[in-house]
């Protein structure tokens, strides 16, 4: 798995889907999000209660969004 991708559940990042799923199941069925980088650029959302996987955006869209945000911050400084 690419190190830029992390699973996110309720403020916590996990390197593996299994860890994230276990945490989500113990956290009242919260969604597991596949994110790009340290930011909440969600690519996929997994709903443990319904076991449904939903695409939020593509990897390229997430990368472009992060790049735009980075460029905005550089311009402001």
Report residues per predicted region.
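Short intrinsically disordered terminal tails
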Residues: 1-4, 61, 68-77
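A subset of signal/propeptide-processing and intrinsically disordered low-complexity segments
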Residues: 2, 17, 42, 64-66
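Intrinsically disordered, low-complexity coil/linker segments enriched for acidic/polar
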Residues: 16, 58-60
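Repeat-associated, polar segments at repeat-unit boundaries in modular proteins
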Residues: 53-55, 62
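A short, exposed loop/beta-hairpin motif centered on an aromatic-Gly-Thr core
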Residues: 8-18
